[in-house]
């Protein structure tokens, strides 16, 4: 299994629609102002956070149960940025829609700009033949409110190509998050 380069990422995005919308370079400024970078890097792709957020609140719940998750545990918010309460988290989705090839698995890591501020970005791997918008989780590990920005980079996706195609892909087994479009809550 080998990590894939910027050339491979560009080819797969442009010829096979693996990432839409796709940025072939690295964007560091927008309208003359510095932003958290996004787009193609040497061996990965820096994804952006969209304007849709679900901010966790403990007003209605006493226990967080992944098998029986209460949608009232979140407050929906839309904007150019989101403030995450201290020691809490928010969900968002990517601007980009992904179509992962059958012989590829991705690993997604948070950007150091956020990590250095105590904001951890968590995303599970994108499995072979998974497609959809990625649901992102931002954890504020600090005792202060934390700000995250829509339309700017938040995490980097690394693409690994297997030596052969898998016998059963995410699509083959009808994975529960296949084709997700908005910020998707846990499904047991």
Swiss-Prot record:
It catalyses: dCTP + H2O + H(+) = dUTP + NH4(+). Its EC number is 3.5.4.13. Pfam families: DCD. CDD domains: trimeric_dUTPase (cd07557). GO terms for molecular function: dCTP deaminase activity; nucleotide binding. Keywords: Hydrolase, Nucleotide metabolism, Nucleotide-binding. InterPro entries: dCTP_deaminase, dUTPase-like_sf, dUTPase_trimeric. Pathway: Pyrimidine metabolism; dUMP biosynthesis; dUMP from dCTP (dUTP route): step 1/2. This is dCTP deaminase. The gene is dcd.
